[in-house]
Amino acid sequence: MKAQAKKIGNGVYWIGVLDWDLRTYHGYTLDGTSYNAYLIFGDDKVALIDNAYPGKTEELMARVDDAFAQEGKTGEECKVDVIIQNHVEKDHSGVLVDIHKRYPKAPIYCTEIAVKGLKRHYPNIKEAEFITVGTGDTLELGGKTLAFLDAFLLHWPDSMFTLLVEEGILFPNDAFGQHLCYSKRFDHEIPEHVLMDATKKFYGNLIVPLSKLVLKKFEEVTELGLLEKIKMIAPSHGQIWTDPMKVIGAYSEWATGKCKDKVTIVYDTMHYSTQKMAHEIAEGIMAEGYDVEMFFLHEDERSEIVKSILDSKAIAIGAPTINDEPYPSIGDLMYYLKGLRFERTGIKRKAVTFGSMGGKGGTPASLGKDLGEYGFDVVDTCEVYYVPDEEENKACFKLGQKLVEEAKKI
């Protein structure tokens, strides 16, 4: 296979893998992704940062070979001296065994926790030389210096960031990434709204519960005097940021709960009664000047819903009752929300719940109880018998208005 490496800096190449066909990953939908890996040429050593998903060896190695060719290297000069493993997860370590077979003398630099994880994932690599590093440690490549920074739980316990000091390129692995698959590598080469939408979706589905750690890491990086040194951010998925403050600013807003005057409405329905309620609630919300994003769980999926919730001041969740319990599809979303812990963004988003019943009912109360435990401030609930009548439609409209009144207090 022939594949081209992309030069992104002085002696620095993107040598990643494009997964054009991936449609589901980490529990949400996407239109492909990239597994970004990088090759850095120093005067004395060549370093490889991260790799790709299992089965992607051929494409990654083809780009490695092309990078050596672009640097004018031939024969025995074409070798990797150092392997940097910022993160254990398989989409960034799945080619590690094949890389080590090709370059058996190259030590693997990673965190202490990563050593344990890599040996569990890849028993055949136990004999490799592992060198553990953390904040304050550096590695000289000859005219180029790699500085390491612990990134515990951003987003796994083993995670770390690597900074190429002279070029000001930060390699933060999953942080600041997006699940996008484009032939272009840089942020400014694709539509901005596409880039930021994908970044928002990535944060909402992966980083939200770590928001407090994000802010602490920004403080640490600032105190270490590293923030002003960052000229480029090269994440492990998606586009490379040539304007690093754009994504750092976005992360800061999301981590501190900065939201729009917007309500996310999510519902499912059997015979369209709950749907009618959702639409009436939406009218009440819009009458108060707030925007609405509406999601029908029969058609829409949870990762898009979570992306919307990230910058919404309030949510409205509705479902009918079946077998004395909430409609099953809503349970999937609720368990997902439980794990994301939106309250860690520093605000309690307002919420209402609603639904129809034909017997015992109780779904709105049940959903409200759960949302309260998940860090939402539940304002009110609404339940109707079978089909909402004219007065109940008016009540739903007023419920939307009430939700906005409470959201304005945030």
From Swiss-Prot:
Cofactor remark from the record: Binds 1 FMN per subunit. Binds 2 iron ions per subunit.
Listed GO MF terms: electron transfer activity; FMN binding; metal ion binding; oxidoreductase activity
Amino acids binding FMN: 269-274, 321-324, 356-361
Binding site for Fe cation 2: 91-92, 174, 237
EC number: 1.5.3.22
Broad EC category: oxidoreductase
Domain Flavodoxin-like: start-end pairs: 263-410
Catalytically driven reaction(s): 2 reduced coenzyme F420-(gamma-L-Glu)(n) + O2 = 2 oxidized coenzyme F420-(gamma-L-Glu)(n) + 2 H2O + 2 H(+)
Keyword annotations from UniProtKB, A to Z: Electron transport, Flavoprotein, FMN, Iron, Metal-binding, Oxidoreductase, Transport
Residues where Fe cation 1 binds: 87, 89, 155, 174
Swiss-Prot/TrEMBL cofactor(s): FMN; Fe cation
Leader peptide range in chain numbering: none
Gene3D superfamilies per the UniProt record, alphabetical: 3.40.50.360, Ribonuclease Z/Hydroxyacylglutathione hydrolase-like (3.60.15.10)
pH-dependent activity: Optimum pH is near 7.5. 30% of maximal activity at pH 6.5 and 8.5.
Domain of life where this protein originates: Archaea
Keyword Lipoprotein: no
Family matches, as SMART domains: Lactamase_B
Function: Catalyzes the oxidation of F420H(2) with O(2). May be involved in O(2) detoxification, reducing the intracellular O(2) concentration to a level allowing growth at the expense of methane formation. Cannot use NADH or NADPH as electron donor or H(2)O(2) as electron acceptor.
Family of this protein: In the N-terminal section; belongs to the zinc metallo-hydrolase group 3 family.
Name this protein carries in UniProt: Coenzyme F420H(2) oxidase
Organism of origin: Methanobrevibacter arboriphilus
Taxonomic path: Archaea, Methanobacteriati, Methanobacteriota, Methanomada group, Methanobacteria
Gene behind the chain: fprA
